[in-house]
Amino acid sequence: MPDYSYRPTIGRTYVYDNKYYKNLGAVIKNAKRKKHFAEHEIEEATLDPLDNYLVAEDPFLGPGKNQKLTLFKEIRNVKPDTMKLVVGWKGKEFYRETWTRFMEDSFPIVNDQEVMDVFLVVNMRPTRPNRCYKFLAQHALRCDPDYVPHDVIRIVEPSWVGSNNEYRISLAKKGGGCPIMNLHSEYTNSFEQFIDRVIWENFYKPIVYIGTDSAEEEEILLEVSLVFKVKEFAPDAPLFTGPAY
């Protein structure tokens, strides 16, 4: 007959398996992770209709090397409700000075480089302290070669300049970049033909007006520069071998 009496002398053995015990922190983190994943799935489902639309990327931030060439820095006075011409691209002497600096001093072009795009960048800063206004800008790319732009125009449907006070224009024509090779030989043979036939055949000549939304006459410091987007081709084989290269 079995003995059901309680006696502490009778030993009992218990086997504990670790698979039934989990870290409390891991349990809470896993629950939060599952909740976050479920919320993320719901949020993505609400954005699925946007897959039918396309967004244009900024070519300025694309692949390639940016080479900046500052054209000029000067101060302009702009009256209220008007915009002043700051870039007109007229005169061969302006071309000569600009592109001589571009070729010889500040732009190391070699034959295996390709100019993909040219950006005109206008940086605007107020010269007087404690002024609160926004900059306005308008530009044109396609115009008659004989067109003479006005120095001052009225403000009609302008573009607001961003928070960094920088107005950037891509001068590339529709259809892609500018496959220019052997730039040194083209430039040395005839400078005028190089500008007219090589550069302006592939890029637009811009006309840019700058203004403000201020009710008073404002003094603006302008920095106008060209930024060249250069494509560099990787060599087929390295020129040097060894741990230093």
From Swiss-Prot:
Nuclear localization signal: region residues: 32-35
InterPro entries, sorted: Polyhedrin
UniProt keyword list: Host nucleus, Viral occlusion body
An example Gene Ontology molecular-function term: structural molecule activity
Effect of residue 118 to F: Forms few or no polyhedra and accumulates with a dispersed granular protein mass
Effect the entry attributes to changing residue 183 to F: Prevents the occlusion of virus particles
GO cellular component terms, A-Z: host cell nuclear matrix; viral occlusion body
Similarity comment text for this entry: Belongs to the polyhedrin family.
Functional description taken from the UniProt entry: Major component of the virus occlusion bodies which are large proteinaceous structures termed polyhedra. These structures serve as the protective package for the virus particles outside the infected host and allow natural transmission of virus between insect hosts, assisting persistence in the environment. Forms the paracrystalline lattice of polyhedra and interacts with enveloped virions as well as other accessory molecules and structures to form a mature viral occlusion body.
Protein name (Swiss-Prot/TrEMBL): Polyhedrin
Origin species: Autographa californica nuclear polyhedrosis virus (AcMNPV)
Gene name for this UniProt entry: PH
